[in-house]
Design a protein with these regions (language model features):
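Gly/Ala-rich beta-loop-alpha elbow adjacent to hydrolase catalytic centers
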Residues: 216, 220
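Non-catalytic accessory segments of hydrolases
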Residues: 2-174, 178-185, 209, 443-450, ...
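Mobile gating loops/cap/lid regions near enzyme active sites that modulate substrate access
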Residues: 390-525
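Alpha/beta-hydrolase active-site loop
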Residues: 170, 180-203
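Alpha/beta-hydrolase-fold catalytic nucleophile elbow
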Residues: 160, 215, 230, 241-244, ...
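Active-site rim elements
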Residues: 94-98, 180-185, 246-251, 307-308, ...
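Substrate-access "cap/lid" subdomains that shape
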Residues: 97, 193, 200, 204, ...
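Short glycine-enriched nucleophile-adjacent loop
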Residues: 221-233
Length: 525
């Protein structure tokens, strides 16, 4: 299917323009009064969905481009919440959400609730991935109707946030940049603002504002692990689930400044004032030419300069965290790029990330790669799986435990029949969101009992802070005791398709402690 066909299909499924309802003609049972208006959703069977609710008072357009998100203001109006908003500006990449129509007017969220009678349901807030460059809530994978049908005792929210050069652009070093001291981390501040809206309004949807779990995958998972490090954020959530993403997905201020300078050169701009005159599509074109990876910044202001150390010092000790990774993370990218694309990608990344290593560390890396068996791509794929995803996941479990907090850790192993994909990045998403029909990555529907069990664990964690399942809650009738990660035994839950079981990390050998774990200090991504 061509991109324009996908775009129109998404519009047909979820798109449109929400309008004010001024004639009083709406179904009161589908309306929820919030601070910034009354929003009217649509019902599918026993699930009511509210799409495209703004969580800011003003959208980040015009002079508000690259400014922190603005609080909502009281509003007595009534509005449709029938359609997804446009996606944030970003590079399409692998993300369906960025194939959809894009706009700077993008800070909206969706709410999925069941009719099942209950007040104060646990709330799960989804933060999408896409390398901080792409993605969006309109992705059919993140349609949570199936999830809420199966788990009617939770409310699910999906949020959008600014991406790429709109969400993570360092500007304060420019001659007129003194009023842009937050621009390098706006995407994260958007997420905090969305969580504030949820805290203040979710009770009207049957949710418990004091029992919120944030969860995400890839950049969304990284966001989930970074948000606890932002001052004042803990009042909005109690726990987090991070699927294949951690606090390593960040950069230094020096790297941020270098990225901005490259952009300015391509666009012929010298000041923020110049940049404000540039059309969003032009910025997008420039970013795609530069191949510059825009990510959150360890600026010492919004985020600490050492995000791992912050966990070790107890920054998240009052939160429960559930983190994990997939067995063959980078194989997804091999499969997606094809041989020529992968070879180019990995050559550039190795030059960028490994060329400057000290000789003794290069020797360790080379030794690791020599021991990897498999196809031509597997040594590189395994190395980058370790440095980008697996080692950082284990390290954050370590640091959370050192800091006195609770960490639950998983290792996801089901494979696609595709010999390249195997158990690649994002392959668990169709399991989490109950979309067995979506097999583009999985190549097949995974075992139904396994899938239900994994979802039950996620929901149980959101409810209680512990993902263990008693026999009566477990789909196969067998109790699943998920141990806390600790510094001695380093126990994890192996999410094997036909044998979910706890194990010591040393038994599974998830990370190479000697030859790849040290790479986490370089914040590779």
């Amino acid at each position: 299917m061509e991109l324009h066909e996908i775009r129109e299909k998404l519009k047909e499924m979820y798109g449109g323009e929400n309008k004010p309802i001024t004639d009083g003609n709406f179904d009161q049972s589908l309306a929820v009064k919030c601070i910034n208006g009354t929003f009217v959703g649509r019902k599918t069977e026993n699930i009511t969905v509210f799409r495209g609710i703004p969580y800011v008072g003003k959208q980040p357009v015009g002079e508000l481009r690259w400014k922190a998100p603005v609080d909502v203001v009281p509003n007595d109006g009534v509005y449709e919440a029938y359609y997804n908003a446009k996606s944030a500006f970003g590079n399409p990449g692998f993300e369906v959400g960025s194939i959809y129509y894009q706009d700077e007017d993008c800070l909206y969220l969706n709410v999925f609730q069941s009719d099942e009678a209950s007040t104060k349901k646990p709330v799960m807030v989804w933060i999408h991935g896409g390398a901080f460059e792409s993605g969006g809530t309109i992705d059919p994978m993140f349609d949570c109707i199936n999830f809420v049908k199966e788990n009617p005792d939770v409310v699910v929210v999906t949020i959008a946030y600014r991406l790429a050069f709109m969400g993570f652009l360092h500007l304060s070093h420019l001659s007129d940049g003194k009023d842009y001291t937050d621009s390098q981390n706006l995407g994260l501040l958007d997420q905090v603002k969305a969580l504030k809206w949820v805290h203040e309004n979710i009770a009207g949807f049957g949710g418990d504002p004091d029992n919120v779990t944030i969860f995400g995958e890839s950049a969304g998972a990284a966001s989930c692990t970074l948000l606890p490090l932002i001052k004042g954020s803990h009042q909005y959530f109690k726990r987090l689930i991070a699927e294949s993403g951690s606090v390593n997905q960040t950069r230094s201020p020096e790297e941020g400044i270098a990225c901005t300078n490259k952009l300015m050169e391509v666009l012929g701009c010298k000041t923020v004032a110049d940049l404000l005159k540039v059309d969003g599509n032009k910025l997008l074109e420039a970013s795609s030419v530069l191949f510059v990876h825009q990510v959150p910044e360890r600026d010492g202001k919004i985020l600490p300069t050492d995000t791992f150390e912050a966990y070790a010092n107890g920054a998240a000790k009052d939160l429960e965290i559930l983190v994990g990774c997939n067995k063959d993370e980078m194989n997804f990218f091999v499969s997606s790029f094809g041989k020529e694309g992968w070879d180019s990608f990995i050559s550039n990344r190795k030059q960028e990330k490994f060329a400057q290593l000290p000789a003794d560390e290069k020797t360790l890396v080379e030794s690791y790669m020599k021991d990897v068996k498999g196809d031509y791509f597997q040594p590189d794929s395994s190395l980058f799986s370790q440095s980008w995803f697996i080692a950082p996941t284990i390290r954050i479990s370590e640091e959370q435990s050192k800091g006195g907090g609770k960490a639950y850790t998983y290792y996801f192993t089901p494979e696609s029949p595709d010999p390249i994909m195997k158990c690649g990045h994002a392959i668990e998403l169709s399991v989490v969101f109950n979309h067995p029909e979506m097999t583009a990555d999985t190549g097949r529907a995974f075992d139904e009992t396994f899938c239900k069990t994994m979802r039950k664990m996620w929901v149980q964690f959101a409810k209680t802070g512990n993902p263990s399942l008693s026999a009566d809650l477990s789909p196969d009738g067998k109790a699943k005791e998920w141990p806390l990660y600790d510094l001695k035994d380093k126990r994890v839950m192996v999410l094997d398709e036909f044998d979910i079981h706890p194990a010591k990390e040393s038994e599974v050998k998830i990370v190479d402690w000697e030859r790849t774990y040290f790479l986490t200090k370089y914040y590779m991504l």
